[in-house]
Structure formats: structure tokens, C-alpha cells
Amino acid sequence: MQPLAHIVDLTANPIGDPAFRAQCKTTLDTAGALVLPGFLTAAALATIRLEGAEHSHAAFYAASKHNVYLRPQDETLPADHARNRLVVSSKGCITDEEIPPQSPLRTLYDAQPFRDFLCAVLEEQCLYPYADRLSSINLHYAHRGQELGWHFDNSSFAITLLIQKPQAGGRFEYVENLRDADRGEMNYAGVSQVLDGERAVKPLAMEEGDLVLFRGRNAMHRVTPTEGDITRMLVVLAYNAQPDIALSESARMTFYGRV
């Protein structure tokens, strides 16, 4: 197993330093998003990109239509209501099972100093891997024309690493604090404005090797279609606040094509 210092640029990102952690937490709490530029070392980034290319043949590809809330359609409302309007998402994915045992991704995911940093910034007591064999580390591929449609997350946070930028497109866009899920305030009017292009959205600039923490439960967000021949590659590091949690079998079939 590689030392963490071979994977993370600890000079630029001193994840064990309390002041650095506090600064990161303040940024995330204020903006709902945190980008740490050059988080991965150049060597780790190159290795992960190569692993992604070598295992791309094992990716499960799926395209789906869904509403922004990622919920079943509400038959009591019109089809053109914000609650029911459909958007498209399409991508490929390899699962934790395809990530090599010696991958820098696995070392990073399992590293206690990294988890301690995440807990401090996200205000979580502990973070645990998924109990199933597929969900903890995923690498997503978006080829030309593939995109992630507008949606809200069901989870309170997302942790990602951009591994390969496309030639164009593949932009992450979001509107923060558009709903209040805990209070059941869905803000249908605001969602309609975003879907109709009548409301300003924020781009979240990220480069290859950057770590991104994002709170997407109340922030509507999307990734625009990939343009050009270079595939967008993004790693998702998924943790749970409780132990022994597995993604449901139905969700695994939807996301991975198997259980």
C-alpha cells in the first residue's frame, strides 16, 4: 500500500492541520461546495486515469429519464408540473469490484487521516464504507453527448475526484439552497425557472486531480453533455454515517446492472 503522501499533495492540502480543516469547513458551509485544487499528486492522477482506461470495458452503461426529485411520478399533478418534468441522465460506471486492490483510490478511501479530514469538514462523527461489494468507490464515464440531468441528491454530501476533463462540455452547474427537503419545501416555482433557463445557475470549476465536496440535497445540480472525443472520468467516494449500510438491490440494479 502506498503512503498517503504519494497520493495526496499534503503540502498544498495539509488535511491533518486543524486550521486547514476549519477553513475548508467554512467554505463548504458558506457555499455548499468545496474544491481543493491539485489534491491528487500527478503520479496518483496518472495511475488512476490509466486504471480507468484499462477497466472501461467493464463499465455498465445506462440512460434514464427522471424528475429533478428522483422520485416516482405524482399522478395527481400534470406531466408538465415541476414535480413530474423529466430530464435525461446517461453515463457508464465501474464499481468498487473493478477498482484494483493496489489502486491509489483504495488507499485514499481507506486512509484514516483522509476520513478524519472528511469527518471534520462534513461534521460527521464517523464515516463507514458501504456494506455491499459495489458501492464504495465508483468511477463514472461520460462519453460524447452523455450528461447528468438536473436533480437534487438524496444524500447530504458527495465526495468526488475529477480524473479526466473532456475537450468541452461536462460542466458542473448548480443552484444552491433551492429547496428545503427537511421542511418539505420543494420550491416547484424555482425548479421550473431553472428547467426553463429563466434562473441564473452557478458553474463549479474543477480541474483534473481536484477533490470536490458538495452538498446536493437542497442544491439542484447537473453536469452538461460531454463534447468531443475525450471521455469525462469522475470518481465518487461514497461513505455512510452509519455502519453496515448497503445500497438497496433495486438501486444496485439501476446503477450497476447487477447486485
Show which residues each predicted segment covers.
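Catalytic core of Fe(II)/2-oxoglutarate
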Residues: 174-177, 181-259
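Aromatic-acidic/polar surface patches that form glycan- and anion
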Residues: 37, 41, 107-110, 152, ...
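Catalytic core of non-heme Fe(II) oxygenases with the double-stranded beta-helix
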Residues: 98-106, 115-211
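Short beta-strand segments enriched in hydrophobic/aromatic residues
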Residues: 40, 163, 239-241
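Hydrophobic residues positioned within well-ordered beta-strands of beta-sheet architectures
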Residues: 36, 157-159, 233-235
